Amino acid sequence: MESISWNTPSVRDALAAVKRDAPFVYGLTNYVAANLSANVLLAVGAAPAIGAAADWPARFGAGANALWINTAALMSSGADTLLTAARAASKAGTRWVLDPVALGAGAPEYDAIVRDLLALRPTVIRGNASELIALAGGTAAGKGVDTTASPESALAFIGDLARRSGAVVAVSGPTDYVTDGVATLAVAGGDARLTRVTGAGCALGALIAALLAQRGAALAAASAAHAIYATAAERAADARGTASFAVRFVDELSLLDPAESSRDRSAGQIGAKRRE
């Protein structure tokens, strides 16, 4: 299995392309995560629009450079809103990310909507181990939005899900794994305090969408997003508390320089991380 990091040239190239092109990224996410998601996109140079104002799902689902749908958007939007955006994206060829938050946690009507979205062929599916095991048809029950399984235990499931859905599938944890059903890439690093920042995992879906907008290989885009996220978290690791870490994390995302030399600044210490 190949590992990638901030020092992988393709990762830096992916971020440079976002900074150069400022892709328009449309998102449907929950109100808890919307602010951080928008700030993450702005920090890397993307142009976000988030929410379900009149006509946005159909118009922006088709017209944005990329779309991401976090299914916890159902907290404030109806299922038709999410399905409209996904259908518009699929029809227009807009690449999109599905984040099936809390799938398998014991809400059958909610889970059915997620599966309806899956049928619309997302480009990338990202989530924690419990969510993705459940989406692949396995038995896994998360603790609300949090995982009770390790990413390693999900590897066989995400490979199968990728092959059946045609999507790249990414599971997050202390080490992230991203697969297209044939090749699997590993991304280590980050900081455990991402698990204490509301919406950190949701915002990762937004970042994946920004990199997908560049139209390169989806596997490379999704894995690069994880590596960029991990690096910013590592560089924020000396923040004193959780709130200062959250602010510093966005700062570090904005300061990442694709042209920097590996000698200019260490990519940080490898550590445990992330809202899984």
From Swiss-Prot:
Keywords: ATP-binding, Kinase, Magnesium, Metal-binding, Nucleotide-binding, Thiamine biosynthesis, Transferase
Binding residue positions for substrate: G199
Pathway annotation: Cofactor biosynthesis; thiamine diphosphate biosynthesis; 4-methyl-5-(2-phosphoethyl)-thiazole from 5-(2-hydroxyethyl)-4-methylthiazole: step 1/1
Binding, ATP: R126, S172
InterPro entries: Hyethyz_kinase, Ribokinase-like
Keyword Iron-sulfur tagged: no
S-S bridge residues: none
GO MF annotations, alphabetized: ATP binding; hydroxyethylthiazole kinase activity; magnesium ion binding
Catalytic reactions on record: 5-(2-hydroxyethyl)-4-methylthiazole + ATP = 4-methyl-5-(2-phosphooxyethyl)-thiazole + ADP + H(+)
Major enzyme class: transferase
Pfam family, one: HK
Needed co-factor(s): Mg(2+)
Family statement drawn from the similarity comment of this UniProt entry: Belongs to the Thz kinase family.
Function of the protein: Catalyzes the phosphorylation of the hydroxyl group of 4-methyl-5-beta-hydroxyethylthiazole (THZ).
Protein's UniProt name: Hydroxyethylthiazole kinase
Organism: Burkholderia pseudomallei (strain K96243)
Gene it is expressed from: thiM
